[in-house]
Amino acid sequence: MSKQFSHTTNDRRSSIIYSTSVGKAGLFTPADYIPQESEENLIEGEEQEGSEEEPSYTGNDDETEREGEYHSLLDANNSRTLQQEAWQQGYDSHDRKRLLDEERDLLIDNKLLSQHGNGGGDIESHGHGQAIGPDEEERPAEIANTWESAIESGQKISTTFKRETQVITMNALPLIFTFILQNSLSLASIFSVSHLGTKELGGVTLGSMTANITGLAAIQGLCTCLDTLCAQAYGAKNYHLVGVLVQRCAVITILAFLPMMYVWFVWSEKILALMIPERELCALAANYLRVTAFGVPGFILFECGKRFLQCQGIFHASTIVLFVCAPLNALMNYLLVWNDKIGIGYLGAPLSVVINYWLMTLGLLIYAMTTKHKERPLKCWNGIIPKEQAFKNWRKMINLAIPGVVMVEAEFLGFEVLTIFASHLGTDALGAQSIVATIASLAYQVPFSISVSTSTRVANFIGASLYDSCMITCRVSLLLSFVCSSMNMFVICRYKEQIASLFSTESAVVKMVVDTLPLLAFMQLFDAFNASTAGCLRGQGRQKNRWVHQPSRILLPRCAHGICVSIPVSSGCRRLMVGYN
């Protein structure tokens, strides 16, 4: 097995589950946590079906050779995820260059490679339109050969604190920007509605919580089966089967959601009234659900389409779509909630969510149809599948999706359950809890970006058997986490009044938020260390160590604490926030 670096932050980021939850983003796909049995071929029985109908296409011989022969994607001794194995067969040129640059820097640091090419010129980056000399063409091969030779001969390749600080920081910076954009999708709704009033803010919070628990979390869990199946089909060069699996999963998920859509329209207010004492909040939340239901099919198609592209090694498509849709979402929230001419008030927030879901789906479709990417994503699409093919082999897909549904639901409940308890403390406490949770989610994006960058670096060192360097990376990650958490603590404590005033003009809510933010600031230190250590575990392929404790570590203690603090109403939001953290 090659000892070269093979992981980038792009493929790590692609396995992150995102939603409009007021809790912290940054959950990973269950396929990344729950190992399948070694050498199990989950697409067995469908290969012939796909091969018979696979469309023919022409391409360069070197591209065919680059894709390589199919090998098992479930090798138990390989810590790489299923998405990464498929991506191995279609490196993006920018990612490949970055990995080579990281290897080159380490070789130069250890004096195993000179800083000049064979011709003595400095290494330079060349644009696509510039001619590349023979020395530059030979340089990647020289780096790869030197790296492999050094690893195989047992020569010591070590890193330094300075080098790891630089690499982790540079890899984390674009992730911070991306994750904040993702977070802005939920932030925009909370921010716009919070100025309408405390009850409207509580209605959006309850509606979003119910939508996440009863719909979006289950949908994302169901769609995680594609992380396994599509990666195997694409790795086997059974390209047509990728499109079949994606459409089949979309059909299953949409049909599974139809009964819940009926419940949202007809029974949501009555069901919420059984748990929430404020009847007006239940009515507002039910209206939120009725509008949001129209966007759920778009959300399903987006999740399936995202995995359709990711299994082909195209990880940046959803990010490009996000760069367009996130600003549009903020604009729509302003126009539909606050604008004097077209604004509709409270219902403008869920309507913005609906429009955004469909725009994200449309964005992925436009990208797939117009992209010049060398992987040609439409080679995996052979048109709409017939009805009999859509309703075939459901059991295998559902069995693979069940662990995903269970895990994602457990993670979401760990955060969303506090919303139910906060509603028993009163409307003001519910609004304050929503604002504080939103601030916590936003503050978490910096340490979480460091965590993803760390897991990538650790995975590369583990793959190259450079265990001492892996330890240095983990120490640097902890140090960077301490620095960023200290900055978060300072900002939250120093500007707590200004932050609270941004979200609400209600004096009671502002006071609760101001009183609670010091607790949140104190917990930033532990939050950052939790993210950092989780990244170290993920890079070592030990995600299960963290996953097996999730229900008992998060859900049960928070339920118990939430019950305790919601009994004495005078305790307010501060004690509830202790359970959140």
From Swiss-Prot:
Mind telling me which residue stretches traverse the membrane in this protein?
173-193, 249-269, 282-302, 346-366, 472-492
CDD domains per record: MATE_eukaryotic
One GO CC term of this entry? membrane
The keyword Mitochondrion appears for this protein: no
Keyword Transmembrane helix (UniProt)? yes
Task: Give ranges for the Cytoplasmic compartment.
Answer: 194-248, 303-345, 493-581
Its membrane topology is listed as:
Multi-pass membrane protein
* NCBIfam families according to UniProt: matE
| Protein name, as recorded | Ethionine resistance-conferring protein 1
Annotated organism of origin:
Saccharomyces cerevisiae (strain ATCC 204508 / S288c)
